[in-house]
């Protein structure tokens, strides 16, 4: 398979296994959910009745007409413990390497089919210039939420895009399924395409 490089007559030859794969919604959904869950802190915590600070002395006599109560740390009292207290836990889900790579290939293939994958020769930014980056993206017609993927991390490119809330910049090593799925258009350099292919093929 050959993909056209935007702004030139050149083409880049790519593997059908990476950029021509069938889309599996179930697989992509599973990998995206697992990726997002791995980013959850899972640090919420509440105290049970045994962990709440307070006296455990019986609050009132057993007899006398009122309801029977023991410690004031019981869940029915204000300031008491929580009945089924939340505890810190990990939301991490296991995803096999083969599964993850297959999902990434499926996403890239679907982006290509939908015309949302724009390949450029390079995306060099010599100096930090947000206005210049906006003009460059406008010329490519990439929509509101573009994802720029380069072979190596570029500090000038990152700093130029930092103040643009809907523009994301990734190098190949930092590419993830959530960023790909959420982008209107993925702008990727020809060198990055080759590196992605080496990683996923």
Curated annotation (Swiss-Prot):
- Which keywords accompany this UniProt record? Ribonucleoprotein, Ribosomal protein, RNA-binding, rRNA-binding
Identify the stretch(es) annotated as Disordered: 43-69
Give a yes or no for keyword Iron in this entry.
no
- State one molecular function term (GO): rRNA binding
Instruction: Pull one GO CC term from this UniProt entry.
Output: ribonucleoprotein complex
**An individual GO BP term:** translation
Q: What domain of life?
A: Bacteria
Which family would the database say this protein is a member of? Belongs to the universal ribosomal protein uL4 family.
Task: Sum up the protein's function in the record's words.
Answer: One of the primary rRNA binding proteins, this protein initially binds near the 5'-end of the 23S rRNA. It is important during the early stages of 50S assembly. It makes multiple contacts with different domains of the 23S rRNA in the assembled 50S subunit and ribosome.
- Assembly state and interactors? Part of the 50S ribosomal subunit.
NCBIfam families xrefs? rplD_bact
| Protein name stated in the entry | Large ribosomal subunit protein uL4
Instruction: Please report the organism this UniProt entry assigns to the protein.
Output: Stenotrophomonas maltophilia (strain K279a)
Q: Which gene underlies this protein?
A: rplD
